[in-house]
Amino acid sequence: MVNLTIDGQKVSVPQGTTIMQAAATVGIEIPRLCYLKGINEISACKVCVVEIQGQNRVVTACTTPVQEGLVVYTNSPKARSIRRTNVELILSQHDCMCATCVRSGNCSLQTLANDLGIYDIPYERDVVDTPWNQEFPLIRDSKKCIKCMRCVQICDKVQKLHIWDVQNTGARTTVDVAGNVSIEDSDCSLCGQCITHCPVGALKERNDVPKIYDVLADPNKVTVVQVAPAVRTAWAEAFNLPPELATEGRMVATLKKIGFDYVFDTCYAADVTIMEEASELLEHLQKPQDHSWPMFTSCCPGWVSYVNKTHPYFVPNLSTTKSPQQIFGALAKSYFAQKKGLKPKEICSISIMPCVSKKREAALFSMRSSGTHDVDIVLTTREFIRLLRAEHINPAMLDEQPFDNPLGQSTGAGVIFGASGGVMEAALRTAYHVIEGKEAPEDAFTDVRGTEGRKVREFTLGGATLRTCTVSGLGNAGKLLDELKAGKVHYDFVEVMACPGGCVGGGGQPIHDGEERADVLGNKLYAIDSNRPMRQSHNNPDVQELYEDFLEKPLSEKAEQLLHSDHVKEHNYM
């Protein structure tokens, strides 16, 4: 162990520990901007400078290892003065129009400047503005970029897509799309992890909230909104609601208060997804020679985009079942429209998702089974929160309301879609029922849960062994695809979520700088699942009615027309 003193406190830590890590063990949080543990430890911002007794120069706490006998001052006049100067220099190259920034109030730079008492910038302003396609689902504002390199590192080290890179040199150094290509022509999957790991407002999703106001004001439109499973785990954070108030019913009430005509649950569509995908898996198992192996899930649009752009060889392996968002949209403009005597074009189908890639998915050519876009507008969880704030709605004051029918009732299986391993578990619950003729034990498939990069398990269905694999994060997915193509591994059924931890850790979720919360939010979904009276998709009476009255059976001709896609043209927009 190495012994040192930090701000007068004796500290004993293992060799190799940095000063920043050592300080944290005794509750001393050293200010920083660029630091991401294990991902971005490059001291780019120079905000974490500290003074060491006996040394003339300050050092960066995030990269300097501890030494025996060091006496460290994290906030001495010298360290504080240099830290202040460094932040002032960053601000001189940053668009400080905080009032019009989506990260205002949740910006690490803004907080740091306030903490340091910086109210004027003594240096000449030098803010670089480069053009960007404002219609693209992911927006980059070069005026706000502080060159912390977090986006570069999260994309390189975690997702391994290498979309961002350093451009130019010297004073003109900036971050932009790598390879001298546009973002549209890059391999970007729109996972949004660069957004959630940006400490400022340099990266954000396209703002589609104004479209909501337009459609709510249109008397000729019936507004139908669906809410994804993961959204219910995080929407209430911004309003500091305790768990007993942050309920599904209160979430529904807020949407009704805004003025949406019908509020439905994407978990219902997830149940339908399972009916189709589980049937598809069983068909593959019955005729293995007719299909490509393994069969991949296809509910994550970031994953589907990734396969199309980087590993097209595996496109035939994707389940043809659409994502719950798109299945809901197709049913809203066909089944629901028929029940209500409406034409598809009279319905505006809106989704609230934890995901940026859903915006791209909704615009694809292949997602127009009704003759119009099946989903017209997609909001992220963050946009939903901004919409509530703009409407001055206090959710705590609203009485709970149920989801509307017939697209509102769901099972626990639909809920767990939002967590890594959830789609796999939900599909296996139904596949087991079909093969064995009885319900699986409650904990039969819970071992597929978790946020590990790759989790391999074997289950017995109908006397045969099913080898499954759940993958979290595109970096892990790429490694898996390489091994599959080389013949190093073999699986029968593979679930992939583009975002580490699944949709609960999605690129459209609320941002908590420096925190990874997928585990915590995923457990919320599993808690909801365990308390549901129905936990298997095939037991949803509304789904049973859908098949009896409209679709006939899973994989029927009508189901194939409305609920399936070959995914071949997933990169083509409307």
Sequence positions of predicted segments:
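Iron-sulfur-associated redox domains of electron-transfer enzymes in respiratory
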Residues: Q15-N75, A79, R206-M574
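Fe-S ferredoxin-like electron-transfer domains
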Residues: K46-L190, T196, L203-D218, V222
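A short N-terminal beta-strand-loop micro-motif at the entrance of redox/enzyme domains
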Residues: Q9-Q15
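Residue-level recognition of alpha-helix initiation/capping sites
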Residues: P14, F136, I146, S189, ...
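Structural motif corresponding to the C-terminal cap of alpha-helices
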Residues: Q159, C198, F336-K340
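Short strand-turn-strand beta-turns centered on an Asx-Gly dipeptide
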Residues: I6-Q9, Q53-G54
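Short structural boundary motif marking the start of a folded domain
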Residues: M1-L4
